[in-house]
């Protein structure tokens, strides 16, 4: 629509009145001064200020922006020239952008309908493609050698708001037929770039393809964002005629002509915290069973796998990312992998992460390629120019990437994610494009063994079939086995039967992951935090008794807790925790040879040291502490030991604590009189007292020592598929891994107890497994 000069002048006066009325506040006049001082050429006008000045003007700007963009630019240009006449060259103008609330004109790419064509909208989404920045001619100057004169011509395309579009053909002769020579140095150009914006993955409709909108940015807005950025773009939604080669077509291509691009926070969809929420979070963080509580609250429909659930909680919390002054980047995100038999709920755990994590993208090994996970260089179908398209890991920046069926991925595609998992960047050097994109995300993968089911006669590395270069990039690697235990099978069957029998009061089915929401409005504060106990859903927890009614958090509160701890708590390492981490890492390295031969899942490398730091920091976040303490390191070692050895090494913790206590006591006694050095631990430091102490305590072995003995023996028998073993070999094996050594009489005493329980049979110094 071509607006006449009178209307243009009236619109310009309206914007001049708006800027003049601002003199008392000085907001926009100061903004114009800053713009002139910083040599910028765009002024951002807030819609709130425009509404306060004139509600009718704000509505007209949104409904018919083509009529008001040029007058607004002319008004700001006039004010800028009055402040500094030398600021703008002849023919230059100050551009105008808009920001602020747009009401129902604040939409996503899926909500852009034909009713928005010709109006100003604010579209939020994630940038998936960026074209190269190209110059667009605005004014051409031509020299005529015959007459010595010059001829200039201006160009406007369909995206311009001033006048009608002009042709794009350069004049080669003047009106008299004389040849013209183009003076390229005197021509005027402006930068031009096209973007593709997609709706954010977490808000896209399930089962539908994400919608995309093309965006045109010009002048100072080019290169203001890159693929993977979450942006909010304000612009005019226009319909461009299709390239039909002369035929009449009713199909139009829609684009968004941007006038303001602003980067959004990664946590734009962050939950809202109330004062009561913060109070309850602090109360939960002070509980002794916070780790178990969060682990049980994650995917309550999955029976068991408590240690894996705890590890998933730490993965969603993450460590602390560090960027040193020398350019070194220290990864803070935790990567995790699950390998095991089919039907052990690996994929269900990935779905639980998708439901809880603020930003999570799911993909599969067979349904994704290397460039689909990282980034790709594509060609634009219309212009033929190269574009950089972001992959799943770039789109999941500051989030979690869930990769199912990881073993089905090709080796070449799997190598593509090596850089992402450690350096957390995607570097592209193809087709004349060299770029580095951020991919700061955690990776949680699930895979089946190379033989379909886990072969216990082979080492974990041979079962997994993945190279060490990739395995070492995973902080945690869990072997999930389908155990043939009648008691466990009975408990699982009861749990699954309760899941299928569970229904609401009206007889309808109910989502298991959203229990507790219906009780949030009944006035009870606990109802909004803990899932209301249901015998059919939760069963009876014999270990916890009465506490079983409030041992699971609602999904809504769990999301709030994880988001709060992940983003607002940044713990730092203390000296005590650093020393404990160094000591623990040295012990893991010393036991590396035994781990490889005895069933260790991961190679113990320098990355394992960083894994301990990340897990400890994540545990400190979970406890809402700003310092990483020794208890956090011990909790991290529990998770790491379970991942490496597939058992709870409580005796390792006891050994570490006792060694630290013995070292501190020895240092203390070195400076004092050594008469009463170890009265309370006479059996540990003086070798002359070992036999005497053991002689009096052979028949009184503590229960925890008996359990540790049985655990070590059972693990050794299972790992080596033994049906009989000598007592001498048992004594050597147990003492090699135990926190404190067992003498011969204690070994025989524990074995006799196991024989009385019909678990083993002893004959002629040989123990036969029943």
Swiss-Prot record:
Chain span(s) of sequence motif Arginine finger: 472-475
Record's protein name: DNA replication licensing factor MCM3
Source organism of this protein record: Oryza sativa subsp. japonica
Region Disordered: start-end pairs: 653-698
Function comment: Probable component of the MCM2-7 complex (MCM complex) that may function as a DNA helicase and which is essential to undergo a single round of replication initiation and elongation per cell cycle in eukaryotic cells.
Description of how the protein assembles with itself and partners: Component of the minichromosome maintenance (MCM) complex, a heterotetramer composed of MCM2, MCM3, MCM4, MCM5, MCM6 and MCM7.
GO cellular component, one term: MCM complex
InterPro entries, per the entry: AAA+_ATPase, MCM, Mcm3, MCM_CS, MCM_dom, MCM_lid, MCM_N, MCM_OB
Catalysed reaction, written as an equation: ATP + H2O = ADP + phosphate + H(+)
């Amino acid at each position: 629509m071509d607006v006449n000069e009178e209307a243009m002048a009236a619109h310009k006066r309206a914007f001049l009145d708006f800027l003049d009325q601002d003199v008392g506040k000085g907001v926009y006049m100061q903004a114009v001064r800053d713009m002139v001082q910083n040599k910028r050429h765009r002024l951002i006008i807030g819609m709130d200020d425009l509404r306060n000045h004139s509600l009718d003007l704000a509505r007209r700007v949104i409904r018919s922006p083509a009529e008001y963009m040029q007058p607004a630019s002319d008004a700001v240009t006039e004010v800028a020239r009055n402040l500094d006449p030398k600021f703008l060259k002849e023919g230059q103008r100050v551009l105008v952008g808009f920001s602020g609330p747009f009401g129902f004109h604040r939409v996503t790419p899926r909500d852009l309908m034909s009713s928005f064509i010709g109006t100003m909208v604010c579209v939020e989404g994630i940038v998936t493609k960026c074209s190269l920045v190209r110059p667009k001619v605005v004014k051409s100057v031509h020299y005529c050698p015959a007459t010595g004169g010059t001829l200039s011509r201006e160009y406007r395309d369909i995206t311009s708001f001033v006048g009608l579009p002009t042709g794009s053909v350069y004049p080669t002769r003047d009106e008299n037929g004389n040849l013209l020579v183009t003076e390229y140095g005197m021509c005027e150009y402006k930068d031009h770039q096209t973007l593709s914006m997609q709706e954010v993955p977490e808000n896209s409709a399930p089962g539908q393809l994400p919608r995309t909108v093309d965006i045109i940015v010009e002048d100072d807005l080019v290169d203001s964002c890159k693929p993977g950025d979450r942006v909010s773009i304000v612009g005019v939604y226009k319909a461009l005629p299709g390239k039909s080669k002369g035929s009449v077509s009713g199909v139009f291509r829609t684009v968004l002509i941007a006038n303001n691009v602003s980067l959004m926070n990664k946590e734009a969809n962050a939950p809202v915290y109330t004062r009561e929420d913060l109070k309850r979070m602090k109360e939960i963080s002070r509980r002794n069973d916070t780790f178990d509580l969060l682990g049980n609250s994650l995917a309550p429909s999955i029976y068991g796998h408590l240690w894996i659930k705890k590890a998933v909680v730490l993965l969603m919390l993450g460590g602390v990312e560090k960027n040193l002054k020398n350019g070194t980047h220290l990864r803070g995100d935790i990567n995790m992998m699950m390998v095991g038999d089919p039907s052990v709920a690996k994929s269900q755990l990935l779905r639980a992460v998708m439901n809880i994590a603020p930003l999570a993208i799911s993909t599969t090994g067979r349904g994704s390629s290397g460039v689909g996970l990282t980034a790709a260089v594509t060609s634009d179908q219309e212009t033929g120019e190269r574009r950089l398209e972001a992959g799943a890991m770039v789109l999941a920046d500051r989030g979690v990437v869930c990769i199912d069926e990881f073993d089905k991925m090709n080796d070449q595609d799997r190598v593509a994610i090596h850089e992402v998992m450690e350096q957390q960047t995607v570097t592209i050097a193809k087709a004349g494009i060299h770029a580095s994109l951020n991919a700061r995300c955690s990776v949680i993968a699930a895979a089946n063994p190379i033989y379909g089911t886990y072969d216990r006669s082979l080492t974990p590395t041979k079962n997994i079939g993945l190279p060490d270069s990739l395995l070492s990039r995973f902080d945690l690697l869990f072997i999930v086995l389908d155990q043939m235990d009648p008691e466990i099978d009975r408990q699982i069957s009861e749990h699954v039967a309760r899941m299928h029998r569970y229904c609401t009061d009206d007889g309808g089915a109910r989502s298991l992951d959203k229990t507790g929401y219906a009780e949030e409005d009944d006035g009870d504060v606990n109802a909004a935090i803990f899932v209301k106990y249901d015998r059919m859903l939760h069963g009876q927890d014999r270990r916890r008794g009465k506490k079983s009614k409030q041992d699971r958090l609602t999904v809504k509160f769990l999301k709030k807790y994880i988001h709060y701890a992940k983003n607002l708590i940044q713990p730092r390492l203390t000296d005590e925790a650093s020393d404990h981490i160094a000591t623990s890492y040295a012990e893991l390295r010393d036991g590396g040879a035994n781990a490889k031969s005895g069933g260790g899942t991961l190679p113990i490398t320098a990355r394992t040291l960083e894994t301990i730091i990340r897990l400890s920091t994540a545990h400190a976040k979970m406890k809402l502490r700003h310092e990483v303490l020794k208890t956090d390191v011990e909790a991290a070692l529990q998770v790491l030991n379970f991942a490496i050895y597939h058992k709870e090494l409580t005796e390792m913790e006891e050994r570490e604590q006792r060694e630290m206590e013995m070292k501190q006591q020895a240092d203390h006694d070195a400076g004092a009189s050594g008469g009463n050095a170890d009265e309370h631990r006479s059996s540990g430091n003086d070798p002359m007292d070992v036999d005497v102490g053991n002689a009096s305590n052979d028949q009184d072995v503590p229960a925890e020592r008996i359990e540790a003995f049985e655990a070590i023996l059972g693990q050794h028998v299972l790992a080596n598929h033994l049906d009989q073993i000598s007592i001498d070999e048992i004594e050597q094996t147990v003492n090699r891994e135990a926190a404190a050594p067992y003498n011969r009489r204690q070994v025989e005493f524990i074995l006799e107890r196991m024989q009385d329980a019909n678990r083993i049979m002893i004959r002629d110094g040989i123990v036969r497994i029943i």
